[in-house]
Each structure stands twice: as structure tokens, then as C-alpha cells.
Amino acid sequence: MRVLVFLFALTLAAQTRMSVEQLRGFLKSSVELHHPDKSVAGYLKKTKLTNRLEPRQFEEFIAMGAGPLTVEALRDLMVATKELPAAAPAPVKVAGPVIPPPSAEEQKRVINEARDYAMGYSKGLPDFLCMQVTRRYIDPSGLGFYGQQDVINARLSYFDQKEDYKVVSVNGRSVDTPMQRLGGATSSGEFGSMMKELFEPNTAARFDWLRWATLRGKRNHVFQYFVAQPNSHWTINYQDRQQVTPGYRGLIYVERDSLQVTRITLEADIPVDFPVQEAQTTLDYDMTDINGRGFMLPLKAEVRMREGKHLVKNEVEFRMYRKFGADTTITFDTPEPLPATATQETPPNN
């Protein structure tokens, strides 16, 4: 059973950095969602741009429908960034050839093969250790730009098909506190249970082929799926006081050649009276070497939730996989985040 635990903690970095392109998206979203002019302007006053805001862009942003306080904040940003380099031009997108979808028979075969793979996934994994790095971000304004709350390093051991987590440090400081007692949002189920539950017969998920995609250089089938609430085992626990098991939907990526699952996305259909109004998860798998053998193992999970206007985002990376053994050691220095290209989907190729 995959469980999300939501315990909101209000700790936020003082200043947000963003590019002009990110600023454009932020303003567009703010206008569409009718955020108060005062709130948007206040947020921009705590924002530092990474490149120059040009006069033509300033005029473009005004034309979007920015309020007078936001316009004044944008003018201040234009003055403050006049010595910064201009943003690089957006790359030109070239449309590739249209790739026909597989036949209905092939689509059915792919799902059946993926189901067999998912049901036997945990049994096929070796005993191992790895480092789990969780970077947690929050946005109490609800405007969509996050400040980092903390970085949690944990030792994750997988032995006899069971996961065990031990927190090693928080923000580089050694601690001996269980994950569930750290507060904030946490998640579990990356090592097989999320995937298996989706394909369980009693879950009765409906799968529909959607499109092709390229992920980490390989072509994937992308299916959309739907799980009705009565068949769901996916749970959200709110502050250990309330719990809900909603229906959910999302996408599942299946590598064309190996028929292994490489990504699962999930969006919960949460009852309107539950404190957490939105919950989304994306889980990526990649081929990883353990003791000279390749295994498809979790690479990164991203969890997003919303309570009222409070937004939470967790980025969970799984690093330094090692074969489980009495003499196995891992250095728990926090690595640099994975590059965006590690989980970036690209247009389908031939």
C-alpha cells in the first residue's frame, strides 16, 4: 500500500530565483487564477531574476492583465536586471515524422506483458542498499514557486522484499529520528507496491493506449489508466488524524523493446471535504548496475500536494545502489541533484 503523509511545516527560503521565461509562466498563471494584485506584487518583490527583463517583455507582461502593483514590481525588476545578460532565444521546435500507433492486439499484448512484469517485480530484485535523498519544498503563497524546506538523507535497505528506512541527516546535520517523525510530507511504495497495486486484478484498472514517447533515449508506449475508488488501495494520511483512499488516474510508460515499466504518474481524485485537495506523484525507473547485473530500479519520485493555498513538493532521488552485505558501506554526503535531462521526456523518435 502506498501512503502519503501530509504534515505541513512553514519554513521558506527568503528569496526566489527564476528566469524571465519562468516569470512569464508565473504571471500567466496568476492572471488566469485571479490571484490578488497585492499578493503577486509582494511575491515579485522577493524574486531575483537570473537574466535581464527587456522593455518589450515588460510591455508584454503588462498586456497579460497585470495589476498596478504588479506592474510597479515588474518595473523594479526591469531596472534591477538591466546589467544582467539577456535570456537565450527559445529553441526552434522541428516536428518529427508521425509514428503510427500499435494495433489493438499489440496494445493488449503490451499491457499483459507489463502486468506479468509488475506482478513479479519485487521478487526479481536483489537485496541492496542505497541512499535516498529527499529535497522538500513548500510554497505558502500558493503562487507556484517553491522555497526549499530541507534535505533529508536516508539509508534505504531492501532485504527479503522488504524496505527499511533510516534517516542519517537533515540539512547535513546527523540525526536519529524516524522519517515519520520529521514532520512535513513523506511517501513510500516506490519499490514495487505502487506498480503492483496498479496491475492487481482486484484493482480493475482500465488501460488505454495514448501515444508514443521517448524517455532516457528509448521509445515507450504511454497508456492512460483509471482506478475507481472502490478498488483503490492508495492512501493519504493527514496529520495522523484523517485518512482517505481515493480513486486515481495517470499514465504508465512501458519501454517498447524490454516491456519494462519506466514511469508511472498518478493524480488522486480526492473528496472535496478532505484537507488535502490535490495529490500527484511521478515515479521514474532506470536501469541500474548492482554487482555487475542490471536491474530496473527507482531513479526519482516527485510528489506534489496542496492543502488550501499551501503547496508542497518533494523530490526523492535514489542514489548509490550497492549489493546488500555485512561489509557494504555508503557515503552519505549529499550529491548534486540529478540533471533535468534524466527524467525529461523527448518527442518520439524512429
Language-model segments: residues:
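Short hydrophobic/aromatic-rich motifs at helix boundaries and adjacent loops
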Residues: 1, 28-32, 182
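Short, solvent-exposed linear motifs at loop/edge-of-secondary-structure regions
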Residues: 6, 52-59, 63-65, 215, ...
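General marker for long, soluble alpha-helical cores
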Residues: 14-94
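Structured extracytoplasmic
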Residues: 86-248, 256-262, 267-280, 286-300, ...
